[in-house]
Protein backbone atom coordinates (compact mmCIF):
# COMPACT_ATOMS: atom_id res chain seq x y z
CA UNK A 1 0.00 0.00 0.00
CA UNK A 2 2.82 2.40 0.87
CA UNK A 3 4.46 1.70 -2.46
CA UNK A 4 1.25 2.53 -4.35
CA UNK A 5 0.90 5.80 -2.44
CA UNK A 6 4.54 6.67 -3.11
CA UNK A 7 4.17 5.97 -6.83
CA UNK A 8 0.99 8.06 -6.95
CA UNK A 9 2.66 10.99 -5.19
CA UNK A 10 5.72 10.72 -7.41
CA UNK A 11 3.48 10.68 -10.48
CA UNK A 12 1.68 13.82 -9.34
CA UNK A 13 5.00 15.53 -8.67
CA UNK A 14 6.26 14.64 -12.13
CA UNK A 15 3.10 15.89 -13.80
CA UNK A 16 3.24 19.15 -11.86
CA UNK A 17 6.93 19.54 -12.73
CA UNK A 18 6.03 19.73 -16.41
CA UNK A 19 4.55 23.19 -15.87
CA UNK A 20 6.73 25.73 -17.62
CA UNK A 21 7.87 29.06 -16.24
CA UNK A 22 5.54 30.65 -18.78
CA UNK A 23 2.67 29.11 -16.81
CA UNK A 24 3.73 31.16 -13.79
CA UNK A 25 2.28 34.59 -13.44
CA UNK A 26 4.60 37.58 -13.79
CA UNK A 27 3.69 38.49 -10.21
CA UNK A 28 4.81 35.05 -8.99
CA UNK A 29 8.11 35.32 -10.88
CA UNK A 30 8.64 38.81 -9.41
CA UNK A 31 7.90 37.53 -5.89
CA UNK A 32 10.38 34.73 -6.49
CA UNK A 33 13.02 37.23 -7.63
CA UNK A 34 12.50 39.24 -4.44
CA UNK A 35 12.75 36.12 -2.27
CA UNK A 36 15.84 35.01 -4.18
CA UNK A 37 17.56 38.36 -3.62
CA UNK A 38 16.75 38.20 0.08
CA UNK A 39 17.52 34.55 0.81
CA UNK A 40 19.54 32.95 -1.99
CA UNK A 41 21.76 35.49 -3.74
CA UNK A 42 24.52 35.35 -1.14
CA UNK A 43 25.42 31.83 -2.27
CA UNK A 44 23.80 31.51 -5.70
CA UNK A 45 24.81 34.93 -7.02
CA UNK A 46 22.89 38.10 -7.73
CA UNK A 47 20.14 37.23 -10.21
CA UNK A 48 21.60 33.70 -10.42
CA UNK A 49 24.81 35.03 -11.95
CA UNK A 50 28.34 34.25 -10.77
CA UNK A 51 27.59 32.00 -7.80
CA UNK A 52 30.57 31.90 -5.47
CA UNK A 53 30.49 28.19 -4.66
CA UNK A 54 26.90 27.04 -5.05
CA UNK A 55 25.19 25.55 -8.09
CA UNK A 56 24.50 27.89 -11.00
CA UNK A 57 20.71 27.78 -10.89
CA UNK A 58 20.43 29.00 -14.49
CA UNK A 59 21.50 25.47 -15.43
CA UNK A 60 19.05 23.73 -13.10
CA UNK A 61 16.85 21.37 -15.16
CA UNK A 62 13.48 22.96 -15.89
CA UNK A 63 11.79 19.57 -15.48
CA UNK A 64 13.19 18.98 -11.97
CA UNK A 65 10.71 20.94 -9.84
CA UNK A 66 10.33 18.16 -7.21
CA UNK A 67 14.13 17.99 -6.85
CA UNK A 68 14.31 21.78 -6.48
CA UNK A 69 11.60 21.84 -3.81
CA UNK A 70 13.22 18.97 -1.91
CA UNK A 71 16.63 20.66 -2.00
CA UNK A 72 15.24 23.97 -0.76
CA UNK A 73 13.07 22.52 1.97
CA UNK A 74 15.42 19.78 3.22
CA UNK A 75 18.84 21.09 2.24
CA UNK A 76 21.49 19.30 0.22
CA UNK A 77 25.24 19.02 0.70
CA UNK A 78 26.35 22.49 1.90
CA UNK A 79 22.90 24.04 1.50
CA UNK A 80 20.93 24.32 4.73
CA UNK A 81 17.23 23.41 4.88
CA UNK A 82 14.82 26.33 4.51
CA UNK A 83 11.65 24.58 5.65
CA UNK A 84 11.56 26.63 8.84
CA UNK A 85 12.04 29.92 6.95
CA UNK A 86 10.08 29.65 3.70
CA UNK A 87 6.43 28.80 3.21
CA UNK A 88 5.35 26.42 0.44
CA UNK A 89 3.97 29.26 -1.69
CA UNK A 90 7.30 31.09 -1.34
CA UNK A 91 9.19 28.03 -2.58
CA UNK A 92 6.74 27.86 -5.50
CA UNK A 93 7.54 31.52 -6.26
CA UNK A 94 11.27 30.76 -6.09
CA UNK A 95 10.74 27.92 -8.56
CA UNK A 96 8.82 30.27 -10.87
CA UNK A 97 11.78 32.66 -10.80
CA UNK A 98 14.51 30.01 -11.14
CA UNK A 99 12.71 28.19 -13.94
CA UNK A 100 12.18 31.49 -15.76
CA UNK A 101 15.96 31.82 -16.04
CA UNK A 102 15.90 35.53 -15.06
CA UNK A 103 15.76 36.81 -18.61
CA UNK A 104 16.09 40.45 -17.60
Residue map of PLM features:
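Bacterial N-terminal signal peptides that target proteins for export
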Residues: 1-6
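Bacterial N-terminal signal peptides
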Residues: 7-13
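Sec/Tat signal peptide C-region and signal peptidase I cleavage site
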Residues: 17-21
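Gly/Gly-Pro-rich "capping" loops immediately C-terminal to redox-active cysteine motifs
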Residues: 26-33, 45-76
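Short sequence/structural segments immediately N-terminal
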Residues: 29-30, 35-36, 86, 103-104
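Short cysteine clusters
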Residues: 40-43
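Axial heme c-ligation environment in periplasmic c-type cytochrome domains
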Residues: 51-60, 73-104
